[in-house]
């Protein structure tokens, strides 16, 4: 990608964080000096760094980038049974105050909102809220999220009165 903007010797500096925001591993990957895709294989990372199953996030910093230097979000969720569906939202580190479109769970479903803090400072308790679309009654998440930590918020447990096809707004 960056090769098309004239970049050469592009490298990725990567840091893997666990769910609590602690560093699991750091390493550098060299990208080819040609137009090419690049994959980061989470199964290989787990083997290389002996992490076992975990929840966390991968911070990617692009070195020697020319032009556009944004790396978009990637989500990796494994489900051996094929019963898990994942989706992502734009991963800008500058959040809006309101996001919409998260579905309430249907009967027998579990919807998890993954809150990932991509900053070196905590997200304070009560600064994230959920509500039924259009409602002023807001559920506030009452825990801090540590720097670079991740938290899976169970939507059904947080808003048990809501169900599909209702939609949820996320207050940030």
Identify the residue ranges that each predicted region occupies.
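Gly/Pro-rich, tryptophan- and cysteine-flecked surface segments typical
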Residues: 1-172
